[in-house]
């Protein structure tokens, strides 16, 4: 009976370590996914700011040419 308890305790201990390692890997994968999302957001922000700058320069010129009040 004592050897059975030892074996079960050993299996439980090894299983706990295995689950802990899997959890760490999952967390690392989630962080990697989050990093790419952050990069996408940064790229979108850069793209939108560039687009707004171009629009702010072009729109007044277009309005001026359309209304012919330059």
Curated annotation (Swiss-Prot):
GO biological process: defense response to bacterium; defense response to fungus; killing of cells of another organism
Claim: Disulfide bond is one of the keywords in the record: yes
InterPro entries referenced in this protein's UniProt entry, alphabetically: Antimicrobial_frog_1, Frog_antimicrobial_propeptide
Highest taxon above the source species: Eukaryota
Maturation-removed propeptide residues: 23-44
Location within or outside the cell: Secreted
Cystine pairs: 64-70
Stretch forming the signal peptide: 1-22
Tissue: Expressed by the skin glands.
Pfam families: Antimicrobial_1, FSAP_sig_propep
Principal localisation: secreted
Record's function text: Antimicrobial peptide active against a variety of Gram-positive and some Gram-negative bacterial strains. Has antifungal activity against a slime mold isolate. Has hemolytic activity against human erythrocytes.
Family indicated by similarity: Belongs to the frog skin active peptide (FSAP) family. Brevinin subfamily.
Protein name (Swiss-Prot/TrEMBL): Brevinin-1CG3
């Amino acid at each position: 009976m004592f050897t059975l308890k030892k074996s079960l305790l050993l299996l439980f201990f090894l299983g706990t370590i295995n689950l802990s390692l899997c959890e760490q890997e999952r967390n690392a994968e989630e962080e990697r996914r989050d990093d790419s999302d952050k990069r996408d957001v940064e790229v979108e922000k850069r793209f939108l700011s560039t687009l707004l700058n171009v629009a702010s320069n072009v729109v007044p010129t277009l309005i001026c040419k359309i209304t012919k009040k330059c």
